[in-house]
Amino acid sequence: IVSISAAGIPVAISIMIAEKLANDDMRGVQQVFFVSLRVLAILGLVFSLALYGSAQWLVDNQIITDPRALIAIQLLSPAIFVVTILSCFRGYFQGFQYMVPTGTSQVFEQIFRVSSMVGLAYYFIDRGLHLAAGGATFATFPGVLAGLLVLIYFYYRQRNIREQMLSQQNPNAICESNGTVVKRLFSLAIPVSMANIMLPMVSLIDTFI
C-alpha cells in the first residue's frame, strides 16, 4: 500500500485530473480528488490498523525473525494512513502541473523526518536498541504529517482559483459515476506501482531463502 500510494496513486490522480482540466471540467476534477481521498483514507486506515494488529502475529510465526522489530513495525503503522492521504494531494497538484506544493512538501517532510529520527534515536539509545530503532522508524510519521500539512495549506490557498474555474465549467462535460472513478484510479495506479513493488518483494523473498 505504501508503494502504491507513493508511486502509483499520484500518477493516476494526476492523469485523471489533467484529462478533466483539458475539458474544462472542474466539477470532474473535484469529483476525482474527493472520491480518491475518501477511498484511499479508508484503505490507508484499514492497512494501518492491519499492520499494527498483525505485528505480533508476524513475530510469533517468525515471518519477522527478530522480535525486537515488533515495536518498529507497530510504530510505522500510523504513517501508512497519512501517506495515502498525502498521495492524493500530490496527485491533485501534479494534475494541475503545479509542482511547487509537492516540492515544498517533500522538503518539509525530509526535514521533520530526519530531525525526528535523530532526536528519537538519540533519546532512546540508552534505553535499548529496539526502542531506538522504533523511535527512528516512528520518525516517518511526523515527516509525512508535515508534508501533508504543507499540501493542505497550498490547497486552501487555491480556493479562489477553484471557484473561478467552477464558474467557467463546461456544461457539456460528461459526468462519471464514483464507481467509474475508483475503477480507473486503480487501473492506472497498480501497473505504475508494480515497478516500485518488485524490488521490495525481491528483498522480502531473499529473507526467506
Place the predicted regions along the sequence by residue.
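Interfacial transmembrane-helix starts/ends
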Residues: 27-41, 182, 186
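Membrane-interface junctions at transmembrane-helix termini in multi-pass inner-membrane proteins
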Residues: 83-105
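Transmembrane helical elements of multi-pass membrane transporters/channels
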Residues: 143, 147, 151, 175-209
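Alpha-helical transmembrane segments of multi-pass membrane proteins
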Residues: 64-89
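Hydrophobic alpha-helical transmembrane segments
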Residues: 105-116, 127-157
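Short membrane-interface helical motifs at transmembrane helix boundaries
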Residues: 46-65
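Helix-loop junctions and terminal segments of transmembrane helices
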Residues: 7-22
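Selective transmembrane-helix segments that form parts of the transport pathway or gating/packing helices
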Residues: 36-48, 189, 193
